[in-house]
Amino acid sequence: MLSSMAAAGSVKAALQVAEVLEAIVSCCVGPEGRQVLCTKPTGEVLLSRNGGRLLEALHLEHPIARMIVDCVSSHLKKTGDGAKTFIIFLCHLLRGLHAITDREKDPLMCENIQTHGRHWKNCSRWKFISQALLTFQTQILDGIMDQYLSRHFLSIFSSAKERTLCRSSLELLLEAYFCGRVGRNNHKFISQLMCDYFFKCMTCKSGIGVFELVDDHFVELNVGVTGLPVSDSRIIAGLVLQKDFSVYRPADGDMRMVIVTETIQPLFSTSGSEFILNSEAQFQTSQFWIMEKTKAIMKHLHSQNVKLLISSVKQPDLVSYYAGVNGISVVECLSSEEVSLIRRIIGLSPFVPPQAFSQCEIPNTALVKFCKPLILRSKRYVHLGLISTCAFIPHSIVLCGPVHGLIEQHEDALHGALKMLRQLFKDLDLNYMTQTNDQNGTSSLFIYKNSGESYQAPDPGNGSIQRPYQDTVAENKDALEKTQTYLKVHSNLVIPDVELETYIPYSTPTLTPTDTFQTVETLTCLSLERNRLTDYYEPLLKNNSTAYSTRGNRIEISYENLQVTNITRKGSMLPVSCKLPNMGTSQSYLSSSMPAGCVLPVGGNFEILLHYYLLNYAKKCHQSEETMVSMIIANALLGIPKVLYKSKTGKYSFPHTYIRAVHALQTNQPLVSSQTGLESVMGKYQLLTSVLQCLTKILTIDMVITVKRHPQKVHNQDSEDEL
């Protein structure tokens, strides 16, 4: 009994903590979010909309609060996105669990949820629930993502095979990302700066390697300059090292560089040996030999057109002197990260001075376009024009701001965007296997058949495009065979308004007063629990009697993989109708992956779609724990768009948006979004799994024990008594 009470108490305590964190971050969510002012114990003032920075700035005493923030930080280090959504989603999940165990009614839960709640309270423990959450993540979530949500995905690539970034799609993605992290007066400028940076750094064959390099060395690739307006931020071709030249000699023509990780000046003896001097003459002779050897090495470097010496260690004065004599510039004391970045760009190994000097050619050299000092706000930097041997074209970002704190916020936002794009460029293997039993090879477990027939797009002839959908089929559990099927969609055709009503999956529906969501007859088809939805939303709908006119707002799709090429500023649209491919005979197994570059329009589309399909899955489940977990997660997902639309009224409010989305899904019509921008599906998926893992940790806490400790006394070692 004590263990059960302690476990229930942990959920209640976690809910109280999460609600406090939710109150902090929810006010700065979305484009309408405000900035939060925090005062750190050091007296430093933080004004930010960045959820990760706000959570890390808090002084937390409760152990569960610290654990939640640690989970958020771990998630951000990997994905760079979703700190505020993490807290909101976790809070709604805890509310759902707490409501079930306390037999509290939730207006968004189905009628038989109390029956399942009593079953769980009598027969289950919290650790069993945590195991059910993990089972949901590994066996149910991935299947729903692959079987259902994948049909709605758009791609950020203009070419599916080469994975070439589409600039307009990247602009929409970055603008939506920075909208919630940077002030309103700067987010568009920072978004455009980031977009320009990538297209200047990437070649036509660039891939995920560029994002990995920029993410790993973002600190070395950006320079912060205080005392200037944000608008002075710019991109500089080449690499800017935050060091000054130890020795600078202007040079033109053929320039080469070497990298050294040890001193060039020879030592008296090698490691592990002993050098004995018996007289001053021997000492002077040894010094003369070292000087001549150093002089010969530097002269030989000059003969090989080496004009730049990059060193990770401090070089002796003798090396600097002979470098200047031979016209060689020296940059020393570089960090290991800076040296690693240069080596990754030019593919150069460090130069090791030979023990026995020879006049042979030095192999470890690289060409340099230019080498000159750069002055930014009275501070000198080293500006290098490196010739890249990889897909990354060296460019540096100069971030300006009136104060250092604002520059740090922009740096964090840019670095987070890099992590988000790095994850977006990866394929995601979905961890589920589903058996196919029907004649068409579709899974009887995950496939939900709508009452209406699937709409088949008319063939536009040569203008049609295709989206590859990668699947792997394992027949008889032995051989794996990769197959590729295609979903045909329209090309970027200009369709008159009269024809838009015919091409339903690719046009925005026009709603007249006869088909608005004001009558009970229409509301009855909007949800699985139609009576509940009618009662819940009818008072809200009566306040608005105008029809919704959304004619002419659409996403035009072109190229080979559902690339978003043009989205009007008034709205955007998702294609929803498709037909699952024929995957072979029965008793075969299907394993799939989510391709890189999958995106969805912003505005809660991912959460509403997953909510809708989870409710459909829960309705067909036969196991109570799967039904309960699906219902809790489905209802918690709606908490995110609720916060996004809390400032909207009328037809743009959350109830109207939700009802329109459900109606569109049930009638095979496109989903219409009132907001512009794109968001990463990979980031949303990783956020969902990270929150479920955090919730699992919370549910395994049996007891929270508070231990009060007195502050330790600090003794001054240099007190007067000791002196």
Swiss-Prot record:
Q: Does the keyword Lipid biosynthesis apply?
A: no
The listed outcome for V240G is:
In BBS10; has moderately reduced ability to interact with BBS7 and BBS9; severely reduces the interaction with BBS12; 8% of wild-type
Name the UniProt key words of this record, in alphabetical order. Answer: ATP-binding, Bardet-Biedl syndrome, Cell projection, Chaperone, Ciliopathy, Disease variant, Intellectual disability, Nucleotide-binding, Obesity, Sensory transduction, Vision
- Subcellular location as annotated: Cell projection, Cilium
Question: Which GO cellular component terms are attached?
Answer: cilium
Q: What is its main location?
A: other
Which Pfam families does the record cross-reference, listed alphabetically?
Cpn60_TCP1 (PF00118)
- Provide a GO biological process annotation: photoreceptor cell maintenance
Task: Give the result of G677V, as annotated.
Answer: In BBS10; has moderately reduced ability to interact with BBS7 and BBS9
Recorded hits in InterPro entries, A to Z, give: BBS10, Cpn60/GroEL/TCP-1, GroEL-like_apical_dom_sf, GROEL-like_equatorial_sf, TCP-1-like_intermed_sf
State one molecular function term (GO). Answer: RNA polymerase II-specific DNA-binding transcription factor binding
> From which domain of life does this come?
Eukaryota
Q: Which family does it belong to?
A: Belongs to the TCP-1 chaperonin family.
Fill in the misc note: Adipocytes derived from BBS-patients' dermal fibroblasts in culture exhibit higher propensity for fat accumulation when compared to controls. This strongly suggests that a peripheral primary dysfunction of adipogenesis participates in the pathogenesis of obesity in BBS.
Q: Which disease is it linked to?
A: Bardet-Biedl syndrome 10: A syndrome characterized by usually severe pigmentary retinopathy, early-onset obesity, polydactyly, hypogenitalism, renal malformation and intellectual disability. Secondary features include diabetes mellitus, hypertension and congenital heart disease. Bardet-Biedl syndrome inheritance is autosomal recessive, but three mutated alleles (two at one locus, and a third at a second locus) may be required for clinical manifestation of some forms of the disease.
- Role, per record: Probable molecular chaperone that assists the folding of proteins upon ATP hydrolysis. Plays a role in the assembly of BBSome, a complex involved in ciliogenesis regulating transports vesicles to the cilia. Involved in adipogenic differentiation.
- Name of the protein described by the UniProt record: BBSome complex assembly protein BBS10
Q: Which organism is it from?
A: Homo sapiens (Human)
Organism classification, top ranks?
A: Eukaryota, Metazoa, Chordata, Craniata, Vertebrata
